[in-house]
Amino acid sequence: MTKGIITSESPEIHWKHLNVCGGRVLDLGCAFWTEAERQEANGTTKYFLSQKPEFYMGVDINQGDITTLSQQYPQGKFLCEKADSAFQMDTWITENSITHIKCDIEGDETQLLQIGNVHNLKEIAIELHYSDTWLKEFMAWFDSIGFECYRHDSVSFCSEISVIYGRLKC
């Protein structure tokens, strides 16, 4: 497993190791992080759509950002919902034949641990909050769903956060 350091919230730095080209993407936590990102329309939606996925679905609780993103990126599907239910996440994954997930949902990422069948999923990137507490559980979950953790990045500006990347074992 490769280890690295994330130095920015900018999507092209923060999520650069998740390649979604040709995939079916579920972006959990797709709203803008800063007002500057919002003004520049430079969030994860723009970043992932620039990679030319077959399908893109963004979910976030910020209705204003969901409205803006829906207008800016009509090729995407956007939902204003709180991603805090394993059942709901599993439904989105199944109904949309999701192959790639980016997850940054401020602690609710732990709901993923309850999903046992990831269907068509090939790759996932998860921002862990309180990463020391949850890292071992996510590594075990990866193993249980047939994934390997290929990268673990610490975040230089917040020691309680890290990003793990997993993919289907060959």
Task: Describe each region flagged by the PLM.
Residues T2-A86:
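SAM cofactor-binding core of SAM-dependent methyltransferases
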Residues K16-N19, T91-E95:
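A short acidic-Thr-Gly-centered motif at the start of a beta-strand
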Residues F48, F55-M57, G76, W92-C170:
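Conserved acidic-Pro-Pro-aromatic motif
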Residues A83-D90, T110:
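Short loop/turn elements that flank and shape the SAM/SAH-binding pocket of Class I
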